[in-house]
């Protein structure tokens, strides 16, 4: 979803001036009739231009339902806020992927208990092995002996979502 990871974190990232200019240019390019706002279709085009994929109906519905009902579409300020949050979420997910890949030394796409033990020896050497085993069992949500990226990402996000 658009805001799932970024919502829970404090704002720690700002767009560079050139990136900010690009977002404004995309807004203007998608606002073909110079209405001052993006319609639903304009917004979908902007997402394709900035992120390289067509947003799902659910994503677009979520964004459109969050805008001021007194406006006909997404104003520039709202658009910039949406894009910033999306970029924050994208950046966070990339960081989680990077951490997972660092622990997945054999590039299998999952972590075993041994991978977990090795990782914890590096980042928390005094942690008892019993605790590492408990953490592994908790993170391995389907109890298949492997921690997938999804399991890993879920564990890192656990308790951080807004209520």
Swiss-Prot record:
Gene Ontology terms, MF aspect: calcium ion binding; enzyme regulator activity
Gene3D superfamilies membership: EF-hand
CDD domains reported for this sequence: EFh
Gene Ontology biological-process entries: microtubule cytoskeleton organization
InterPro entries reported in the protein's UniProt record: EF-hand-dom_pair, EF_Hand_1_Ca_BS, EF_hand_dom, Myosin_RLC
UniProt domain EF-hand: residue ranges: 18-53, 91-126, 127-162
UniProt superkingdom: Eukaryota
Swiss-Prot/TrEMBL keywords: Calcium, Metal-binding, Repeat
One term under GO cellular component: cytoplasm
Residues noted as binding Ca(2+) in the record, renumbered to the chain: 140, 142, 144, 146, 151
Protein's name according to its UniProt entry: EF-hand calcium-binding domain-containing protein 11
Organism: Homo sapiens (Human)
Gene symbol of the encoding locus: EFCAB11
């Amino acid at each position: 979803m658009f805001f799932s990871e970024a919502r829970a974190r404090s704002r720690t990232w700002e767009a560079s001036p050139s990136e900010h200019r690009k977002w404004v240019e995309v807004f203007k390019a998608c606002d073909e009739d110079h209405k001052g706002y993006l319609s639903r279709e304009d917004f979908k085009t902007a997402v394709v231009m900035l992120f390289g994929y067509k947003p799902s109906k659910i994503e677009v519905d979520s964004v459109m339902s969050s805008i001021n009902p007194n406006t006909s579409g997404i104003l520039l300020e709202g658009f910039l806020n949406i894009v910033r949050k999306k970029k924050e979420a994208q950046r966070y997910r990339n960081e989680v992927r990077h951490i997972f890949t660092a622990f997945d030394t054999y590039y299998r796409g999952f972590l075993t208990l041994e991978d977990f033990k090795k990782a914890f020896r590096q980042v928390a050497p005094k942690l008892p092995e019993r605790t590492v085993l408990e953490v592994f069992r908790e993170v391995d949500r389907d109890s298949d002996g492997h921690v997938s990226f999804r399991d890993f990402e879920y564990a890192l996000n656990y308790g951080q979502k807004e209520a």
